């Protein structure tokens, strides 16, 4: 599991190493006018919430850091990716079945439910892939090449021939 998540997050690192600060901050692409940096920050904030709540067993997805420097500067984004990857590498697979409480606001109020650590990591990974797909659209509109052919594709998505 960790290898798959790390491989996916490294796609983000490769993207950031190959774009300009202007491209990273660009918010001109309709319909959402979001930046690559905004998506990167959001993706990594979800993982960060997992690690912030790991010791207590209470993971709160509402309490994201929202570090604006991560949204504005590629080097800050790369550093955040590297911090999350380092924390992932420190996890033990024996802990994936550990029960944790996960709190989030689904739009009709705050809810707390039991997950396994593995379950919330899978959700964070799928969430990252989803946002990479959104980034794929922004990247395309900005005329930037994707880091690789799997960027933003869920492994279960059928490949077109």
Where are these regions (language model features)?
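Short, contiguous alpha-helical
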Residues: 25-63, 110-150, 158
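Short amphipathic alpha-helical segments and their helix-coil junctions
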Residues: 16-22, 107-112
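Short, contiguous, pocket-lining structural segments
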Residues: 1-8, 31
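Hydrophobic packing residues in well-ordered alpha-helices of helical domains and bundles
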Residues: 5, 9, 36, 40, ...
